[in-house]
Amino acid sequence: MSWAGKLLRVNLTKGICQSEALNMQWAKDYLGSRGLGTKYLVEEMDAKVDPLSPENKIIWATGPLTGTMASTGGRYTVITKGPLTGAIACSNSGGYWGAELKMAGWDMVIFEGKSPKPVYLLIQDDEVQLLDATDLWGKSVWDTEPAIKAKHQDPQIRVSCIGRAGENQVLFAAVVNDLHRAAGRSGVGAVMGSKNLKAIAVRGTKGVGNFKDPKAFMAASKAAKAVLAGNAVTGQGLPTYGTQVLMNVINEVGALPTRNHRDVQFEGAKDISAEAMATPRASDGKAQLVTNQACFGCTIACGRVSKIDQTHFSIQNKPQYFGASGGLEYEAAWALGAANGVNDLEALQYANMICNEDGFDPITFGATIGAVMELYEMGLLTKEQLGIDAKFGSAQALCHFVDITAKGEGFGKEIALGSARLTAKYGQPDLSMSVKGQEFPAYDGRVIQGIGLAYATSNRGACHLRGYTIASEVLGIPVKTEPADTVGKPGLVKAFQDATAAFDSAGICIFTSFAWTLADVAPQLQAACGDEFTVENLTTIGERIWNMERDFNNRAGFTSKDDKLPKRLMTEAAKTGPGKGSISGLDKMLPEYYDLRGWDHDGQLKSDTRTRLGL
């Protein structure tokens, strides 16, 4: 059946770990990972709880294809109520940790309560221990993982943990596994820190192989891998250039948010692009890019491994950063770079390294620095407050801020709040480029209309991974739609959102959807789990998950008033590029989107929508 069939419930307050049978009806209705984990959360928890209180729960969940031979079957999701937004937080990660949990015989782990002291959970197949983490508290991600492996004398243990940002409850702290892969958004790491939970270490030896039809599964998996290999994006573009291939593409479209969304094109885009990463430096004749890297079972291998120039100011007298590390990915390069007007590639990689080492989201961090730099140039923040001259374009300021954020030193305590709270504190809330308190990713929503609608309606706050209409509006996948058009975009956004929920919940990477449709996923799920997982049923499952998340947010207090974009995107036209003169057409699209969703004018689920989806 592909699911392991059991979950682990950990009461941190009492120090008790208990095994439970997985609710198989829920598994059939919500698949796993994002969908099934959210189902458990919404059924067990009041939506109005304080995200950083013991009453909040946090769940690690795998999907039915996690740990299998399905390409990219290494994904898992961390589900909780997010402190950055106060909304549902479902943050997805790759690497090897998710597959290891599945191989240990567990579909998910549910944490509740709060430990009286720092602890970590050790899972070795069926043997589970909650252990003292006092000696680990205060350590970085990069020190925590090797310390746990050394303590248990097992280099094959996989670790999902927090760094200093999570411990100090930075509101955009991440959960990091395999040193460089992260459930990065919405502050899931802060929830972990609020519970005094440092890490989950897993070693699984059982394997995953309880398929309904093993031969059919192998055939379906093989066919799907061939589709990935033959696709220009998943077979060529991503393996060669990684996600950074988008930097020049999006800049040419005129949709690369620059200097806190004041501009839509960055004159330094080529300096921080994938091509620049692969070009030998003048200083030492070596390229920053060392190699590409794959997550568990992945045939795409979009990950990057890089080295910083040892003479760069950011790592002078810091030999611990001379080695190779993960990155840069497109979103991080944009947030640390164009969003702040910084075109120093070495500085971006340094900042990305610290985000990984200390465990916090580079998107929210970088976007928050963009707001700080604008406040500084407006004279609302001073050099004395910030500790540095922080004009747009300053690589030195970027590196200074990344060093102090997780530690909570100086102005780092303010940055740790995220841009929405920070700009409100200084009387300029319109300078936060965010939705529901979560900062925008690397696409301008007034130039590309569909992604603007996707941001506004995303259940976890602004997010490209909840409805990646860039595939259609820029790349022409599966069909080309015009970025400037608003007609037809509500249906496009809904379709992408529902399909993405199904992909996430299956336990596979969303990047497969550049080549796959649900028609490629369905045969794999049918062979692994059961005949009921048709394309039609998977589409309904995705829609059910989306509406379940929305309903949680409604009960938490969110309404249609929260489905909005910043004033800048609604009133300040794009200055350059193909979309020059554009503003967001959100007001034209939102009513139709609500109708397609089966929601009322206040963004609440109608009764017939609940009935149709079984909510």
Named regions from a protein language model:
Residues M1-N92, Y96-L615:
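Intrinsically disordered, low-complexity segments enriched in small residues
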